[in-house]
């Protein structure tokens, strides 16, 4: 049986080292990319880098890191669907059981290069699949997440559903910041290309 896996990719690194350490102590594997992976490795945390799972290095100045079937398949597979699990096995993809992502505060320094695509995609994928996957977007939740995993062996369905709601609120807020930025550029950009 595979270990439980958490994918960590955070802008706000508050508490992430302790969180990862606790997960490892509970038998979890940590997957990470970019600045989060570097931060964890520098702190002595054993990390499986996303590039190891995808077989592809990040590209386009970091615009493409986690947008890959080996990541999203591992997040989106319905664990109660035998065909999903068989397909993952046939493709050599392992499940990802917990996605920990928080997004760059776009309103603080807006611009095209700071629009995150992969982060929101992972958050939304995990939230969609809350029956199988937990998603954490708030560092203040790390302690309660660890406590619940330690006590119950995993997150309850109720907790995963609450976290999914928080996740969709997080991505909605992020998207609203981007819309606001475009609204400020209204004179420069057309409302529609049609």
Located regions from the model:
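ATP-dependent carboxylate/acyl-activation modules
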Residues: 3-8, 13, 19, 59-62, ...
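Short coil/turn connectors at secondary-structure junctions
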Residues: 2-5, 25-28, 43-46, 69-72, ...
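N-terminal glycine-/serine-/threonine-rich phosphate-binding loop
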Residues: 1-53
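A short, charged helix-loop
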Residues: 98-110, 117-158
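Glycine-rich nucleotide/cofactor/substrate-binding loop typically near the N-terminus or early
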Residues: 35-106
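Solvent-exposed alpha-helices and their adjacent loops that cap or buttress functional pockets
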Residues: 1-2, 21-23, 64-69, 89-95, ...
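Active-site loops and adjacent core secondary-structure elements that bind or stabilize anionic groups
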Residues: 140-148, 152-194
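General beta-strand structural signal in soluble alpha/beta enzymes
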Residues: 8, 29-34, 49-52, 77, ...
